[in-house]
Amino acid sequence: MGLGGDVHTLLAGCGHNVHVAAEDYLFHTGGPADRLYLVRHGLVALELVGTGGSRLVVDTVTAGGVVGLSWLVPPYRWYLDARAVEPTDAIELDADCLRRKCDADPRVGYLLLQRLVHQMYQRMQASRLQMLDVYGAHSDR
């Protein structure tokens, strides 16, 4: 994620390493968004559950990416499912710890937020391109 030393220090006190087996879920839609994952190795699919239980992969996250941005915005609930497509190693960060540290040092909180907003922007752009692919670039108007 390209974080500076101050942000690394902030993150170090809030997280621990986790291993997620292939096909296991990091979280499910509607659950409490109480953590953030920094993917170190592996592949995670972000999925929407459609009618009849069908799943639509809206994005994938690889090494260096972030999974779980919903901890930033109340009501702190997941709006997607996150599934490890292959064995995945990540740093799991506690959201309450991150919010407390960001409140205590707004400068570091701002640096972290800048990087996370960049991740959000990339996801939004990927979704936009996916919609153009599905629905076409032209309108019938």
Q: What residue ranges belong to the model's regions?
A:
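Short alpha-helix capping/helix-loop boundary micro-motifs
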Residues: A12-G13, P32, G53-S54
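Cyclic-nucleotide recognition modules
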Residues: V58-Q114
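Polybasic "coupling" helices that flank or enter modular domains
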Residues: V85, L111-R141
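Glycine- and acidic-residue-biased ligand/ion/polar-headgroup-sensing regions
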Residues: E23, D34-E47, A63-G65
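A short beta-strand-loop-beta hairpin characteristic of the jelly-roll/cupin
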Residues: V44-L56
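Cyclic nucleotide-binding regulatory module and flanking cytosolic helices
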Residues: M1-A22
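Short phosphate-coordinating micro-motif centered on Lys-Gly-acidic
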Residues: L26-G31
